[in-house]
Amino acid sequence: MFSFVDLRLLLLLAATALLTHGQEEGQVEGQDEDIPPITCVQNGLRYHDRDVWKPEPCRICVCDNGKVLCDDVICDETKNCPGAEVPEGECCPVCPDGSESPTDQETTGVEGPKGDTGPRGPRGPAGPPGRDGIPGQPGLPGPPGPPGPPGPPGLGGNFAPQLSYGYDEKSTGGISVPGPMGPSGPRGLPGPPGAPGPQGFQGPPGEPGEPGASGPMGPRGPPGPPGKNGDDGEAGKPGRPGERGPPGPQGARGLPGTAGLPGMKGHRGFSGLDGAKGDAGPAGPKGEPGSPGENGAPGQMGPRGLPGERGRPGAPGPAGARGNDGATGAAGPPGPTGPAGPPGFPGAVGAKGEAGPQGPRGSEGPQGVRGEPGPPGPAGAAGPAGNPGADGQPGAKGANGAPGIAGAPGFPGARGPSGPQGPGGPPGPKGNSGEPGAPGSKGDTGAKGEPGPVGVQGPPGPAGEEGKRGARGEPGPTGLPGPPGERGGPGSRGFPGADGVAGPKGPAGERGSPGPAGPKGSPGEAGRPGEAGLPGAKGLTGSPGSPGPDGKTGPPGPAGQDGRPGPPGPPGARGQAGVMGFPGPKGAAGEPGKAGERGVPGPPGAVGPAGKDGEAGAQGPPGPAGPAGERGEQGPAGSPGFQGLPGPAGPPGEAGKPGEQGVPGDLGAPGPSGARGERGFPGERGVQGPPGPAGPRGANGAPGNDGAKGDAGAPGAPGSQGAPGLQGMPGERGAAGLPGPKGDRGDAGPKGADGSPGKDGVRGLTGPIGPPGPAGAPGDKGESGPSGPAGPTGARGAPGDRGEPGPPGPAGFAGPPGADGQPGAKGEPGDAGAKGDAGPPGPAGPAGPPGPIGNVGAPGAKGARGSAGPPGATGFPGAAGRVGPPGPSGNAGPPGPPGPAGKEGGKGPRGETGPAGRPGEVGPPGPPGPAGEKGSPGADGPAGAPGTPGPQGIAGQRGVVGLPGQRGERGFPGLPGPSGEPGKQGPSGASGERGPPGPMGPPGLAGPPGESGREGAPGAEGSPGRDGSPGAKGDRGETGPAGPPGAPGAPGAPGPVGPAGKSGDRGETGPAGPAGPVGPVGARGPAGPQGPRGDKGETGEQGDRGIKGHRGFSGLQGPPGPPGSPGEQGPSGASGPAGPRGPPGSAGAPGKDGLNGLPGPIGPPGPRGRTGDAGPVGPPGPPGPPGPPGPPSAGFDFSFLPQPPQEKAHDGGRYYRADDANVVRDRDLEVDTTLKSLSQQIENIRSPEGSRKNPARTCRDLKMCHSDWKSGEYWIDPNQGCNLDAIKVFCNMETGETCVYPTQPSVAQKNWYISKNPKDKRHVWFGESMTDGFQFEYGGQGSDPADVAIQLTFLRLMSTEASQNITYHCKNSVAYMDQQTGNLKKALLLQGSNEIEIRAEGNSRFTYSVTVDGCTSHTGAWGKTVIEYKTTKTSRLPIIDVAPLDVGAPDQEFGFDVGPVCFL
């Protein structure tokens, strides 16, 4: 029989052999790397190491290092659950609703063993709908819409010829409607030449015939009596010019001459003076950070901070000294039966048992996940007929129906293509010149243009500064539990030994039940930025870029050569609306259009009814590992595991307690003598020995040495037990005990100290997109960033929304039916139709043969959201997105005041992050930076102010004679001349195109006189002939009696107003006419443009203050963007008013030889030529002039023009006006009056008066034209155009400033604002955040704010400087300087009209000044502070809102006086 020691030795040897064998196997495995991972096979199925499965519902197996270990499932008792059910595929019954009687819930039994894995739960409900997806690409354009409804009926009117089928009193009273117009017939052949024209006017008498030949000389007769005086001889040749006479008296003032032709282009002027200093360039790039300033003076002691977070547990203290043993307690009651002891060591391997009987079939497992769809089944039998199918293709066109009633005349058709060129007709007689038409009224504003094309995606902007550090991350997953410790052998408790060396890592214990969630780890340091990702997919097309600025007007090009006659011009502007024509004939059917492009695939249809369950598919391969689940709750303790193999030697344990007294061993062999001991105590007295024999008495000797030691006596009886000895020294460390059974799981340890940051890990795959975080609190509004570089011109944007329909135009004349147009271009695909309702599922029909691919159906409506699918495989990492555009810079917080330097304290525990401090004040501006590179030249400055008028120049020479005036009115018909002979009938020539007039030929010879014809009817009016040569002098007629003066004729109907002539040169100023009567009020103008942006809404409640993030590193400055493409050429600006005349320049160098002079005046008419042959019939003339105007409506009335006094001035031009001066004299006066009135109007335009009817552009213009006028209120119209939107302003005539008043100059003085948190002082905008507050508007009472906004925009453009002041009335409210602190932290903020903030301190360009400061402390009395702001950036004024800071208490009141904004 083995002793206990031998048994232990044997077990140790066995464990060593097993370990060695395992290591050898491991080495062999390590050498053969191709051996697959450890798996197990059961029932033909292969499982991986550590896999757990249930071959039967009540049996559970695990693959452990290639062996299958199985165990029965032990079910918990189901108490208080009468209706417990065993789910399919499960072993243990469960309560159906999970409810137990409430009375039993309080009795808690002993915690049972760990239950099995529960069955897979039913599929959860569909999640809530996701957020809206990224907007899709714009859809293809829809098809053209259906034709609109017919427009309103056209105008009726005085177009009698077209409406001659109208009302007929003699008929039955109805209106006879003509039938539809037939189709146009084919073009006819050219007609024969027309009949000869009517008889021409009587020709002038022929020249006297040549004298006949002289007869023979007769004899001389007697002298006759003196004859009568002969007729006057013909005028002799003109004599030589006489000498120059003395100058005559000054003639009456002539009419202004017509404008001479424009002179040649002058020489290039000298360079102008340097322009005004340009605007400041944009702010330079941010300078390098300055060196840190010196420490400031110590601040006041801050308030006591909040208590910090609880610190981390400290390191364990040193072990205390061992306490004294306590007194022995009384014996306790007997304890409960202890748990079963640990399993024994593994027994020897038993013989293999016989196969057990087949187990019973397990209960049915739970329904599996729905399988993949099976392969398609064979075609079923033919089902019954399905529901009616969808509509078929449209049928063939039906026969024409009977013609309907003629519809209302249609709108004019689109203009057809030009027909073939017809043969030229014979030339018609020349028509009269039409009267000039009236100037058209100003057209309505055109409809808003289509939005521009979408811009091309701009290049990525420069990298923004690194953003603020993100919010604290979610807690990381809990780390894996450490390996279980080995169990030490029991011993008596020794003093703690020195720490042993850490032993090697033990094999992994069985998986423990999940522990409680560990504490939140502290965030690690930020990893290095990841490598740049692949480029992302192309983004959506960007929004359209704004149009670039207008380019400067280019120089005029040289004149081109005359071009060939151009093709026919495009259709002219739309004419006046005509009467509706008859309906045109129906056009021929157009060719079928091309097939449309294949439509886009429709969206998924509605979810159909669920199909039948498919057969179970084959087991799919294991899916990829899912993301780690959240940590489960702590499970119940599991049942004890199988006995493990002995572990390796553990580290030396602590010294055990002293063992009990052992049995005494056998006596050992005697050792060698020890060194001599110290003298012992005297032994007890020995027993008296027997007496020795008597020796002889010796002499007394010296005392001898001690004798040898006697033999030991017999052992005495054992003594009684002695008192316990002192505690011995600790024994040597015992050998390691065998590993104990697995201990219970320890409690979660305290949170460890933060580890040092790990090295950067390998770049991981891109994780799945997380759920969207909550919206952050709105940040403070940043200051406007500098304008970015202009992006390249964008591609054409999608067409904008259709504008609202304009008002229906007047109906046009009916156009002739156009010819059939070409087939239209292929239409764009139409909008997707709405999806129809899902029909009920029909019975399954037989599988038909595959039909041809049908047209793509219209996309259906978006289907309902499907239930969430199973997680897909992990995708490849998505490409990294492009760097986003830089965010707007936040407001720079002013640095806080530096605190006093404290003594170096010990490092305190980490406190919670405190709330962000208030922004400090802005520091003083730094020293000026180095000079920047020279900037590119600025845009041309505004034109300088015109110089003062120069001295009066020398009078110019008299202008050349003007071009001949317009053709005179038609004269009265002359008396019939003496009858001439009719000419011969000329042959009718072929009708040629009319050639250009040839040069005038020399006068022809006189023809023989013709016979007298009969008196012809007066012919049609010919064009007036040249003046005839003077006829032969007739006999003197007898003087007729003077006729009575004729009665004045009735005034003729006024002709239509002629077009505005080109403006003539400025006439000399006429005498001022009397003021005309006030004109009628004009019609209301069209609706103005959209009003200005409304007031901002009230500020929302203040959000919680976010935690201040770490400051990011400054990003490198991005490269400059590419230059923008040049903008389209802008429209020419309106011509400015003429400046005053400059001083005469110095005499220039002599010019080149001048061009030939103008042609001289027309010479006297030559002798009359002989009558020419009759010309061919002319082509038909152009349409005659319009008939006389209808009854007067709102006609053009010249009565508003001031009538000059009707002096009878000498009329120098009378000889050229007409043959009968008396008839025309009244007309001349009217023309002269109109001319004078026009010149007066032109004078008003060039030198406006500032009245409502004649507003100036700015007060500066008024001051320049009328320097002696006084300051006061005048009307100005900076945007020119119609004067109905002129505004009333105050003109300061000393300075030329234009001052616009606010519509409400004063704001009541009262308490406007009560703060919910009076200690939280911040600026509150009066118009934006205060109840009943408003933003300031300008323009005076009754003006339209939209008009004023436009006029102010123009006024800013024409000004270089603006200023305004505001008076703040206060009671207990600081406006600027705080008397208590001496600083400006409580000063008001102003908001300019470009929404920039104007402050009391900081950058000097954005600071205001104060002229009176009476609001520096809380005195309880009213005071005032006057604020003034002057700037060259005119877009910042006027001020539209004010934000005080020192308000909000019930006793704090304020009000404003808003001054005018003045532009210069």
From Swiss-Prot:
Outcome following mutation: G263R: In OI1; mild form
Disease entry from the Swiss-Prot or TrEMBL record: Caffey disease: An autosomal dominant disorder characterized by an infantile episode of massive subperiosteal new bone formation that typically involves the diaphyses of the long bones, mandible, and clavicles. The involved bones may also appear inflamed, with painful swelling and systemic fever often accompanying the illness. The bone changes usually begin before 5 months of age and resolve before 2 years of age. Ehlers-Danlos syndrome, classic type, 1: A form of Ehlers-Danlos syndrome, a group of connective tissue disorders characterized by skin hyperextensibility, articular hypermobility, and tissue fragility. The main features of classic Ehlers-Danlos syndrome are joint hypermobility and dislocation, and fragile, bruisable skin. EDSCL1 inheritance is autosomal dominant.
Outcome, altering G200V: In OI1; patient diagnosed with OI1/OI4
Impact noted for substituting G1058S: In OI3 and OI4; mild form
Residues with Allysine modification: K170, K1208
Segments of skewed composition (Basic and acidic residues): 229-243, 1093-1107
Modified residues (Phosphoserine): S171, S271, S787
Chain residue ranges for the region called Disordered: 98-1214
Protein name in UniProt: Collagen alpha-1(I) chain
Region ranges (Nonhelical region (N-terminal)): 162-178
Effect seen on changing N855H: In OI2; uncertain significance
Entry binding sites for Ca(2+): D1277, N1279, Q1280, C1282, D1285
This protein's encoding gene: COL1A1
